[in-house]
């Protein structure tokens, strides 16, 4: 499978997701109040997992692996928490939540096929919580059109690059983080050293 999860995942309806979110966030607020905002991130996560188990929010899984493959390329992602097989929780200890954090969680939703996630930042004086949601399914992400009228097929390398990117999108779907597609292309070319200066591009006036 192009995208393989290390555990079974069950997408939640919005109502069920918010019900779990309410219970989990109550525990997170309690932990933040008891231990303060400078507790190490790994200890925060341990405490969240322990309290979820005490509250019978099962199963509680941590560091869930998602493996993305194409040909001999493979990349692993690890999700912070999966509670009740469908509640995705990502914890941060940053000065503030940033677009990169939201993009990361959205990427996880695309990879898992889930529709909702909770993103939490524990470092500020008051806990930051954001919902990240998408209506895009894997099927929708694989339904795309390629616009290549301005692409220059002026070499075998250029043709290979276009065909490879399209093959990756067919395998994984569109809208995953750009760095993933870039890493795959670089790997399939033989690595970073071989990739640099390998392609001949059209002059700027033709782009």
Which residues does each PLM region occupy?
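Long, highly charged amphipathic alpha-helices
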Residues: 23-27, 47, 103-107, 184
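Interdomain/boundary linker segments immediately adjacent to catalytic/signaling cores
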Residues: 1-35, 135-171
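A generic secondary-structure micro-motif detector
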Residues: 18, 38, 94-95, 175
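Active-site metal-binding core of divalent-cation-utilizing nuclease and nuclease-like domains
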Residues: 31-86, 125-137, 150, 154, ...
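Nucleic-acid nuclease catalytic cores
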Residues: 88, 92-139
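Short secondary-structure transition/capping segments
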Residues: 107-115, 163-173
């Amino acid at each position: 499978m192009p995208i393989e999860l290390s555990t079974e995942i069950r997408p939640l309806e919005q109502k069920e997701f918010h019900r779990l979110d309410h219970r989990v966030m109550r525990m997170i607020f309690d932990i933040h109040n008891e231990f303060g905002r400078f507790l190490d991130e790994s200890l925060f996560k341990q405490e969240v997992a322990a309290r979820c188990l005490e509250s019978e929010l099962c199963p509680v899984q941590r560091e869930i692996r998602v493996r993305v493959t194409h040909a001999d390329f493979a990349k692993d992602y690890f999700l912070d928490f999966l509670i009740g097989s469908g509640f995705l929780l990502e914890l941060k200890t940053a000065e503030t939540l940033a677009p990169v954090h939201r993009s990361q969680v959205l990427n996880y939703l695309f990879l898992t096929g889930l529709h909702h996630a909770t993103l939490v930042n524990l470092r500020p004086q008051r806990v930051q919580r954001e919902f990240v949601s998408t209506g895009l399914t894997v099927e929708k992400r694989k339904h795309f059109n390629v616009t290549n009228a301005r692409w220059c097929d002026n070499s075998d390398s250029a043709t290979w690059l276009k065909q490879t990117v399209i093959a990756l999108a067919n395998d994984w779907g569109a809208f995953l983080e750009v760095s993933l597609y870039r890493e795959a292309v670089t790997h399939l070319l033989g690595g970073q050293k071989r990739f640099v200066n390998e392609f001949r591009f059209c002059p700027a006036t033709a782009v």
